[in-house]
Amino acid sequence: MAHVRHFRTLVSGFYFWEAALLLSLVATKETNSARSRSAPMSPSDFLDKLMGRTSGYDARIRPNFKGPPVNVTCNIFINSFGSIAETTMDYRVNIFLRQKWNDPRLAYSEYPDDSLDLDPSMLDSIWKPDLFFANEKGANFHEVTTDNKLLRIFKNGNVLYSIRLTLTLSCPMDLKNFPMDVQTCIMQLESFGYTMNDLIFEWQDEAPVQVAEGLTLPQFLLKEEKDLRYCTKHYNTGKFTCIEVRFHLERQMGYYLIQMYIPSLLIVILSWVSFWINMDAAPARVALGITTVLTMTTQSSGSRASLPKVSYVKAIDIWMAVCLLFVFSALLEYAAVNFVSRQHKELLRFRRKRKNKTEAFALEKFYRFSDTDDEVRESRFSFTAYGMGPCLQAKDGVVPKGPNHAVQVMPKSPDEMRKVFIDRAKKIDTISRACFPLAFLIFNIFYWVIYKILRHEDIHQQQD
């Protein structure tokens, strides 16, 4: 009986300790579970689980593989806009390029934060769109003081990728109205390898293109209206997504007025000063004319130095050509004045030579017929036509008068002839003083009105 009681005591003790051990294990498990709930997973462990080697994430495969295409929304923030070069027809811009897409493989719920800002080195661990700039001529990243890149992952799997770039983009320009032209420069964003079956670029709905506050250009006025378009590209390898933004640039005239138009205008006006200089001051007028022509030629060459060698005529070319024409015409005007003012000397020399020939001819005739006075009287020969005047008389010693025997008018004296031609030369100068400025004024009216209308039409076409 005592043995039975002792056995029951041992059995009850065993069950007691077994129950105590079980309760201890349960308590320990709950404690560990509570600790695990109160202490979240470390960021390193979380990232390893999300996109590490053990996560099964493959950056070589796009999201929704063999499914619908990935929609990537783009946004551009312009830090600086400038270095617009007409010779190379390109422009330089510094931007923040932001791309946003959804990758379901990166969605998470284990981590408490709504988003994670990751180091740029993690970019190699995830899939990224193969975006490139179709009209890019040169580009570079920024690495001071670190890589200027941003990677942010959201709970729902959205990915934000931002990068700072400096781009040199081509911008074909029509310079027919230069420097009163309006240009349109584009920026095209295109997928390099993924067709539209895999990837589609779209502009962000709100503020797709932003410009830094206070951004100004030295020679252009950047219009606030940004023209956003889709430019799908069709190649032999397929149809590729493409989006573009068009920047409308209106050239400012201030620089060209000061550097080109006003100096050339003053040179033309300076050439008119020769009209008020005495025609006898040949060195002064010739020196002034040649100087203005050479200066205008240099000015015209300088205006073309900063422009490409295009095959069409520009507005500045027309202006410079007309100014050069006016300056050269002023020099030719003095040549005409000088020629007219010296014509009396040539005329006197010609008359003297002609008179000598006429007198010699008359004397020859006279001696030929002087042997027979009767024949001379019967013929009633008159030497009036040969310049002899009343030296010889006809029959009865009377000079016949009639319609065929008009009395010769005595030529003017050399001084009178000189005065006539000098007055004519002075009249040319007087007419030039009025005609040259008037013609140049008419040209200016037509020039500025026509190109003002063309400029307005270009602006209107851009708005359409």
Curated annotation (Swiss-Prot):
Record-listed Phosphoserine modification sites: S370, S379
Biological classification of the source: Eukaryota, Metazoa, Chordata, Craniata, Vertebrata
Record keywords, A-Z: Cell membrane, Cell projection, Chloride, Chloride channel, Disulfide bond, Glycoprotein, Ion channel, Ion transport, Ligand-gated ion channel, Membrane, Metal-binding, Phosphoprotein, Postsynaptic cell membrane, Receptor, Signal, Synapse, Transmembrane, Transmembrane helix, Transport, Zinc
Regulation: Inhibited by prostaglandin E2, probably via PKA-mediated phosphorylation at Ser-379.
Extent of the signal sequence: 1-33
Described function: Glycine receptors are ligand-gated chloride channels. Channel opening is triggered by extracellular glycine. Channel characteristics depend on the subunit composition; heteropentameric channels display faster channel closure. Plays an important role in the down-regulation of neuronal excitability. Contributes to the generation of inhibitory postsynaptic currents. Contributes to increased pain perception in response to increased prostaglandin E2 levels. Plays a role in the regulation of breathing rhythm, especially of the duration of the postinspiratory phase.
Binding residues for Zn(2+): E225, D227, H248
Residue ranges of the TM segments: 256-277, 283-303, 315-335, 431-451
Disulphide-bridged cysteine pairs: C171-C185, C231-C242
Major location (coarse): membrane
Subunit record text: Homopentamer (in vitro). Heteropentamer composed of GLRA3 and GLRB. Both homopentamers and heteropentamers form functional ion channels, but their characteristics are subtly different.
Family to which this protein belongs: Belongs to the ligand-gated ion channel (TC 1.A.9) family. Glycine receptor (TC 1.A.9.3) subfamily. GLRA3 sub-subfamily.
Chain ranges on the Extracellular side, renumbered to this chain: 34-255, 304-314, 452-464
GO molecular function terms attached to this record: extracellularly glycine-gated chloride channel activity; glycine binding; glycine-gated chloride ion channel activity; metal ion binding; transmembrane signaling receptor activity
Alphabetical list of Pfam families matching this protein: Neur_chan_LBD (PF02931), Neur_chan_memb (PF02932)
PROSITE patterns named among the record's database cross-references: NEUROTR_ION_CHANNEL
Organism field: Mus musculus (Mouse)
Residue sites binding strychnine per the record: Y235, N236, T237, G238, K239, F240
Protein name: Glycine receptor subunit alpha-3
Gene behind the chain: Glra3
Compartments where found: Postsynaptic cell membrane; Synapse; Perikaryon; Cell projection, Dendrite
